[in-house]
Amino acid sequence: IITAYDIEKLLDEPNVLGLGEMMNYPAVIGGDEAVLKKISAAREKKKICDGHAPCVRGRELQAYCAAGIRTDHECASYEEAFEKLQQGMYILIREGSSAQDLEPIVRGILEHKTDTSRFAFCTDDKKMSDILANGHINNNVRKAVSLGLPAEDALCMASFHAAQCYGLTGRGAIAPRYHADIVVFDNVTDFSINSVYKAGIAVAPASDIALQNSETAETVTPASFSIKRITDSIHVVPVPRSAFAAEQFMPSGSDNFHVIGMQRGTLFTQHLVFPRQECTAQLKEGKLCYLAVLERHKNTGNIGRALLHGYGVSNGAIASSIGHDSHNIIVAGSNAADMHRAVEEVIDMKG
């Protein structure tokens, strides 16, 4: 556990801009002393405190901001973003792989003619394959402009506003006394990148392909880093196939079942309730699947189970030990045998 003392030491590092997203917002709002000490450590050194406050509104939002939190990237609607803007926050508009919040917020900005000087862009969990296919912040700019946002506003949100937010003086603009870190686009519609300059020197002409860099993790990982710490992190009790049997998810004696409904482009899910007969039919059709979360840190043997709608697994199973923000083993599948096999595979490969 990182303490306030640890954070004080880290904040002295010149490349540390501030305190990363304060996810434990209930503790901030409730005045938890240990949490507030971490925020105070950043504020005393005049470093920014990033927020993480999905759906926090009203008086709770005021308390959260009063503690010293200055940004939020969890807004999924314009209304939430505008309320946080009114409380003095910078809004980082997120367009990631799962959470795609840019369109509703930009449409709200345009409809209400909202000043954009305290808006910036972020991605927050974007897969490398998506970055390769669609780009990173330049994709945010492209999409915002396609929705009608003026190109100059979108470019400022991608550069100058973000620099202002994080106190990066001398960055984010092309002007005297500013670092000559420049991206040159072919146009301001699809924003295809022509070249990149760092400190005034061309470092990436259009002909360069980033994937040609042959440097691997082995060559850049510090020798002092313990590989064992990350390859020996799966601690689970043996899991029998029966743990994924249908009756574990749909016990006898129950006529209706709660179902998690996935929605594309957002982290928000729907709370659905289906009768047993409907669940059975949708499981056969592949519209529903089984979902389980296995505790993998302390050998507790705890397993959470649910029915999941909209994931698309109709035959087989998918398991992963990456699952923000607790990173237990998650498995979704159509049958016990495949779910058990997928979990065993994750355990065998040590995550």
Predicted regions and their residues:
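Histidine/acidic residue-rich metal-binding segments in metalloenzymes
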Residues: 2-20, 27-93, 100-121, 132-146, ...
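A broad detector of the eukaryotic-type serine/threonine protein kinase catalytic domain
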Residues: 24, 69, 89, 163-167, ...
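Active-site microenvironment of metallo-dependent hydrolases
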Residues: 132-148, 152-351
